[in-house]
Amino acid sequence: MVDGVMILPVLIMIALPSPSMEDEKPKVNPKLYMCVCEGLSCGNEDHCEGQQCFSSLSINDGFHVYQKGCFQVYEQGKMTCKTPPSPGQAVECCQGDWCNRNITAQLPTKGKSFPGTQNFHLEVGLIILSVVFAVCLLACLLGVALRKFKRRNQERLNPRDVEYGTIEGLITTNVGDSTLADLLDHSCTSGSGSGLPFLVQRTVARQITLLECVGKGRYGEVWRGSWQGENVAVKIFSSRDEKSWFRETELYNTVMLRHENILGFIASDMTSRHSSTQLWLITHYHEMGSLYDYLQLTTLDTVSCLRIVLSIASGLAHLHIEIFGTQGKPAIAHRDLKSKNILVKKNGQCCIADLGLAVMHSQSTNQLDVGNNPRVGTKRYMAPEVLDETIQVDCFDSYKRVDIWAFGLVLWEVARRMVSNGIVEDYKPPFYDVVPNDPSFEDMRKVVCVDQQRPNIPNRWFSDPTLTSLAKLMKECWYQNPSARLTALRIKKTLTKIDNSLDKLKTDC
């Protein structure tokens, strides 16, 4: 860019016509000529002596005024004689004794040009041409500089290309005829994270074909994609939610999160499509969709209800617990647990998704990793201590207790769809009867903290032993005092006990 700025004045200097040596310097010991002198400046004289003679015509108050005379100073003659004729004045100059005697200056007429005019127009044309040329050259230099800047910016957005090398060659290789299960099983022994090695992740990402959009939200879109004939889910984050993509990618690539009730991670990548950078998170695909969508269309029997809630509790317990050893993991709190962030699998179990707000804690270092994400959880599922801002943000157990509150609300959503004695409630979100569809922070704070309301328990639940047990369990998740709430492990054990008692009842029958 600096080179382009330095070149511009040089080009203009080259393009401008350079004056001759005769114009630059006055003559040494100039020769004087006798000239005819007519007009007011001559007085009583009819001749004068000077370096140049002239004859002029000007218009003054509508009258033509003719004058003749001489220039005694070289520079004065140079300035005047070089001036092109105008509609109001014309000057003709010459050198030689009495040379202006027979010269009569004429004003320019339409269609007639004078040598001075031609030179003037030529000079102006050359100046304009040189400026246009310089501007075009500068525009070209700017274009090249912008292209380089864009390329450099793209490289910055893809830091793994620099660290691990580009993968263009890998795409043409046979990753090969391996299935995703083969790749993921192999990756368990090759690192501490849940995902594939970075290069394989990027290879898989570049080979995915997007087939259909299966969901849209505030933070992006979810697509069904295909990789070597297998369905995968591709979550495309919006640019404003880059922090969530980065957090989830970081967590999956550094923590061993492989569990049947946690959404299976495959790969993560930054890719450029339609001249914009897209943030991809590639996971297992579950065609039955989210628990939120599933419950609106499906009623549950006792077995399927318990299978769903027990699988969610198992996934949450796995997140909350810290596992030590080479295949270990830190304790993790989800912070945005809700029915929309839980997916239903073909076997009737569920898996927890969306770890963009997750918090990690390691007991050995006592380090709390909250991440750097300005996004907050879903207001409808916020615990009282979050709504009244009394949560201890430097205590990891506080975040786990927030998850338990949200789990109790999900448990209530599921239990409403369980049929007992031929009766079942329509699906409704928590607090549907006391807050609007998109409640504000203040709406939820008043209902949960000030009025201390909880979701309504229908009377018909108390005629069914399973629903009665679930009602008791969810109430223990909704204590106003966070430390009084159950732990995820305690909930899992209680649900397992309820499930076992149901199996025993079937056996006895």
UniProtKB/Swiss-Prot annotation:
All residue ranges annotated as the Protein kinase domain in the record: 208-502
Enzyme Commission designation: 2.7.11.30
Catalytic reaction equation(s): L-threonyl-[receptor-protein] + ATP = O-phospho-L-threonyl-[receptor-protein] + ADP + H(+); L-seryl-[receptor-protein] + ATP = O-phospho-L-seryl-[receptor-protein] + ADP + H(+)
Entries under InterPro entries matching the protein: Activin_recp, GS_dom, Kinase-like_dom_sf, Prot_kinase_dom, Protein_kinase_ATP_BS, Ser/Thr_kinase_AS, Snake_toxin-like_sf, TGFB_receptor
Sequence intervals crossing the membrane: 124-146
Extracellular side: 21-123
GO terms of molecular function: activin binding; activin receptor activity, type I; ATP binding; BMP receptor activity; cadherin binding; metal ion binding; peptide hormone binding; protein homodimerization activity
Main location: membrane
Residues of the active site: D336 (proton acceptor)
PROSITE patterns: GS (PS51256), PROTEIN_KINASE_ATP (PS00107), PROTEIN_KINASE_DOM (PS50011), PROTEIN_KINASE_ST (PS00108)
Cofactor(s), by name: Mg(2+); Mn(2+)
Chain positions found as Phosphoserine: S501
Subunit-structure text: Interacts with FKBP1A. Interacts with FCHO1. Interacts with CLU. Interacts with type II receptors AMHR2 and ACVR2A. Interacts with BMP7. Interacts with GDF2/BMP9. Interacts with BMP6 (when glycosylated); the interaction may induce HAMP expression. Interacts with TSC22D1/TSC-22.
UniProt name for this protein: Activin receptor type-1
Organism whose genome encodes this protein: Homo sapiens (Human)
